[in-house]
């Protein structure tokens, strides 16, 4: 079975770069497997990720070398670049985290702060996984990754997905119900939502790890993986609906409502994530092992690029239409995540000078009569 090879490929070798696509592939496998899992003990051990403990390092080294040799070209091209992009992404996201750590003044900054932290975790796990592949491909060196990284990688990916859904949904509520959002929104909603987002995927991945590694219950394993795949599909659908609603609202009411920079950040980040993660929907349709390995590498590389590009989006939106060259990164970042329209810039873009408005102080003073003193000589 293809799944048995993939389970070994990602779990036993410690290649966390395939973790995000295992759930999607398992859903398609369950449609074909039926009740054969209970009749085939070998398939049971492969499906649940239960591996023999008495394998020697030489055997594992030989198996990994054979698996890598089947996809030498994608490894030579993708793995080193993925390591480099991951390290650059860690540096960029780390800078954003440091700038926002003490300056989260609105709900969107709180969400972005947690999103950056999840991106850093995911990029670190991906860098370690691809570094293992690179060393094995070019130098034949094998080192084993701790087991907790196999949980940490999909956990951080799911946190990123949930945070993007929360950001899109909150922005959608803010645009559709502005009065309720400004007056009745609970103050600590962002902190509570972020806490739940970190806790829910953590519990899901812990239970998934128990199903796959210790309990050896195939039926429960299959049901759980189906539910996990459904959970991912629902989150992606909610993000699509929120982004589309924001876009339609902006196109229909662009004259009445002034767009903020954080709106631009949301409208760029959410579709970019969906675009880079789009190949995930293709993975369940692949039955060839070699093709699945190549697709898994590409999916991982795309997700790494997306996580690394988020800070570039923040700084680009924050510095857009600003002619000041000497501005700190903190000011640019705070401007990008500000939830207030820039009145002066919008009026200037419309050809209106704010100082010439009828309600401005200068205009009122010009309308007042001036006093004239006349010195009368006696």
Curated annotation (Swiss-Prot):
It is a multi-pass membrane protein. Residues 1-77, 137-154, 208-221, 287-297 are extracellular. It comes from Homo sapiens. This is Mas-related G-protein coupled receptor MRG. InterPro entries: GPCR_Rhodpsn (IPR000276), GPCR_Rhodpsn_7TM (IPR017452), MRGPCRFAMILY (IPR026234). The keyword Glycoprotein applies. Gene3D superfamilies: Rhodopsin 7-helix transmembrane proteins. Residues 102-109, 170-191, 249-264, 318-378 are cytoplasmic. Belongs to the G-protein coupled receptor 1 family. Mas subfamily. Residues 368-378 have a biased composition (Basic and acidic residues). It is found in: Cell membrane. Glycans are attached at residues 54, 57. Keywords: Cell membrane, G-protein coupled receptor, Glycoprotein, Membrane, Receptor, Transducer, Transmembrane, Transmembrane helix. One of its GO terms (molecular function) is G protein-coupled receptor activity. Its main location: membrane. The chain crosses the membrane at residues 78-101, 110-136, 155-169, 192-207, 222-248, 265-286, 298-317.
